[in-house]
Curated annotation (Swiss-Prot):
Keywords: DNA-binding, Metal-binding, Nucleus, Repeat, Transcription, Transcription regulation, Zinc, Zinc-finger. This is Zinc finger protein 559. It comes from Homo sapiens. Residues 14-89 form the KRAB domain. Its main location: nucleus. A zinc finger (C2H2-type) spans 91-113, 119-141, 147-179, 185-207, 241-263, 297-319, 325-347, 353-375, 381-403, 409-431, 437-459, 465-487, 493-515. The gene is ZNF559. The keyword Ubl conjugation does not apply. GO terms for cellular component: nucleus. The keyword Acetylation does not apply. May be involved in transcriptional regulation. One of its GO terms (biological process) is regulation of transcription by RNA polymerase II. It is found in: Nucleus.
Amino acid sequence: MVAGWLTNYSQDSVTFEDVAVDFTQEEWTLLDQTQRNLYRDVMLENYKNLVAVDWESHINTKWSAPQQNFLQGKTSSVVEMERNHFGEELFDFNQCEKALSEHSCLKTHRRTYFRKKTCECNQCEKAFRKPSIFTLHKKTDIGEELPNCNQCETAFSQHLHLVCKKTSQNLHLVCKKTHTQEKPYKCSDCEKGLPSSSHLRECVRIYGGERPYTHKEYVETFSHSTALFVHMQTQDGEKFYECKACGKPFTESSYLTQHLRTHSRVLPIEHKKFGKAFAFSPDLAKHIRLRTRGKHYVCNECGKEFTCFSKLNIHIRVHTGEKPYECNKCGKAFTDSSGLIKHRRTHTGEKPYECKECGKAFANSSHLTVHMRTHTGEKPYQCKECGKAFINSSSFKSHMQTHPGVKPYDCQQCGKAFIRSSFLIRHLRSHSAERPFECEECGKAFRYSSHLSQHKRIHTGERPYKCQKCGQAFSISSGLTVHMRTHTGERPFECQECGKAFTRSTYLIRHLRSHSVEKPYKECGQTFSNSSCLTECV
């Protein structure tokens, strides 16, 4: 009806009244429900045909304001009549049976519905919301060629996307940057060239420490949205890429690539300003935050640098001696809340971090991380002097102090020197009667917590260290170490006098007495070089 007439719009000028039917209030009251429904269907059909030929673009110039309002879903005399006579029924759209709470929502939905339905391809029955996309689809459906990039043959939807306005080259701007490797955006921090403004923004976030993307469930922040997406996959347990060398799984191929560098020791990411290389880009970012002036917080006392003010604030308490977090069980105080939380687990016995390999549980996540290396064999801390590797940083630091031969911590009673203050504190207990670690089962006390842990296995019968050769188990690791020498034949403790070797240091000490006149055990007038001979005499 209307569709055929509208094709001749360019020749004949018309008014809104040519396609619209209107009633007075008196005439409207004479219509029954069926007639009113018919009227509404006819008007909607007319509107559908108008949208089909993109008639909305002509409304502003050819039709009056009331007519525009009707076709664009705004208030008109027809809509007012429907509102008066139908009331709430106006908001139930009869085409898709969707109910809407507001009249404005109905108008928007009606316009979207008919536009979607009218932009429908007769060839493949696909429907489109926008006439421009529908027009493009019709071109591809009839075999019309789209404009292509003359270097990679990528097709684009419109010529204006393809032609560069500055050079008039037949090449899409984004595609042009890909082929020419153009990098017009330069980071002021690292002087790196970047292909787009979005890449520049991400680079600025890395240097500034900005992390705008937050995971609501785990309260973690990320510098860009892709990192947040990968993190969410990790939390869901999705792991896709596996290392062929060690079997470690990763959620992203880029993570696997970074991990492979740990096997090959390749350090491809270099910072231009400082000349230092890194295997992982996050390590570079961390290094930058610590080295770049103006983007960190410095302690005035010792010069130590921090990436955020809260960490600096906690550090300052080391100098002031302030410990605001106190344990209500034993009175021990800490500089930060995390230290108190970890300490409380020593009273409650809580060990929330469990190893999935052997089931062993730990009070701190860092202890679990170190423990996992005993299963994987990973030793990330390697000494450059002798090549010896360690599973944790504390062992590595202790080892590094052995090379210069410096032992700054001296015992005032016996003169023995130590490389760490903690070792000296432990040693001082050998001069005193202090035994702070007591067994709850039998009351026996020990100088060191490790000795108490070993002792408890006597009560529990636990023997976690098992020989893979013969199956014999031991309660302490040193017992397994000594036992393994019976299989390997190793005798590392050798006498400098006669060359005789032993599997244990205690055996060597006892043997050395045979070369000296030392006989410390005295009973019944006789002297003995070792306790076993004394036992036989008794």
